[in-house]
């Protein structure tokens, strides 16, 4: 359960876009931003922006401001204040302290090599050793082996992964993504998460966290991934090029085509606000591609 009470908002639709500041927004980021924006606005909901700056060694100086500037340039205006995870460490630590005190979490000193020797999944080796340093793992009492995706139906998680006691605070003192994102979504009243299909497996762990916290899980919608011509996911880690800030309308239209919109010719003559308004009015989940990976001509807007 939660160590203290979150201030819950109303149950009207609240979505969010939560990029990490490890580089500029690329075409794959735009897909996630647009999908979450259209899903929220088509339901007259709020669209929040949260900067997930949990991992300083991987962050690019100035990237957070550049991301926000890019969203504004593309007229993807968010509701409320931007939230930064780097300012919320107290929230994460309070929950971890509660779990440590209750015995729900424990320290682990197993190396990656040791876990590989276990078969690739952590087997709970340190659970009863009563260590006082290392990474912190959560005892998994609510494993999730499947969940319902709003577009793709039932999604399955490998049993070994679902049952694993996963890390909630790293050995280097950095907070783990799964814990932070769930606590933030609860705190911000998020009702639905729209994001890329590369996060399907973490979804199981996040639903487990909701249940262990005594909270109702959000709904999930996973969007197809934009791949480059070599079949690699467009990502900051793969050095994907930032999207063009000088021609946002054409980039928005290309991203909308990727998301399955049948774009009328006249929309190519419309301004940015008109394009986005049309997108909100014509957004349908059943138009999204069934494939979760799309290797096509899309590569940051270039053929």
UniProtKB/Swiss-Prot annotation:
GO cellular component, one term: cytosol
Motif ('HIGH' region): 19-29
Residues at which ATP binds: 236
SUPFAM superfamilies: Nucleotidylyl transferase
Cofactor: Zn(2+)
Record's cofactor remark: Binds 1 zinc ion per subunit.
UniProt-listed Enzyme Commission number(s): 6.1.1.-
Name of the protein in question: Glutamyl-Q tRNA(Asp) synthetase
Source organism per UniProt: Vibrio vulnificus (strain CMCP6)
């Amino acid at each position: 359960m939660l160590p203290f009470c979150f201030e819950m908002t109303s149950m009207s639709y609240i979505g969010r876009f939560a990029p990490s500041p490890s580089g500029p927004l690329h075409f794959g980021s735009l897909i996630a931003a647009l999908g979450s924006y259209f899903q929220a606005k088509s339901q007259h909901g709020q669209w929040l922006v949260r900067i997930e700056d949990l991992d300083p060694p991987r962050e690019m100086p100035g990237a957070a401001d550049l991301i926000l500037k890019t969203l504004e340039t593309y007229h993807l205006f968010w509701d409320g204040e931007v939230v930064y995870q780097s300012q919320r460490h107290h929230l994460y630590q309070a929950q971890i302290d509660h779990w440590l005190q209750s015995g729900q979490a424990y320290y682990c000193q197993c190396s990656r090599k040791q876990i590989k020797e276990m078969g690739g999944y952590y087997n709970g080796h340190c659970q009863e050793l009563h260590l006082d340093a290392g990474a912190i793992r959560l005892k998994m009492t609510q494993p999730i082996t499947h969940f319902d995706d709003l577009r793709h139906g039932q999604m399955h998680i490998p049993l070994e992964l679902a049952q694993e006691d996963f890390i909630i605070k790293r050995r280097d003192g950095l907070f783990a993504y799964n814990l932070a994102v769930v606590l933030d979504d609860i705190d911000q009243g998020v009702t639905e998460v729209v994001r890329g299909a590369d996060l399907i497996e973490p979804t199981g762990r996040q639903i487990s966290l909701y249940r262990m916290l005594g909270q109702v899980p959000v709904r999930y919608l996973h969007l197809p991934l934009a791949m480059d011509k070599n079949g690699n996911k467009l990502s900051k880690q793969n050095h994907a090029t930032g999207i063009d800030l000088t021609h946002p309308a054409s980039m928005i239209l290309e991203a909308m085509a990727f998301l399955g919109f049948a774009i009328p010719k006249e929309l190519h003559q419309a301004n940015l606000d008109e394009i986005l308004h049309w997108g909100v009015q014509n957004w349908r989940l059943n138009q999204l591609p069934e494939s979760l990976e799309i290797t096509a001509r899309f590569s940051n807007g270039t053929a």
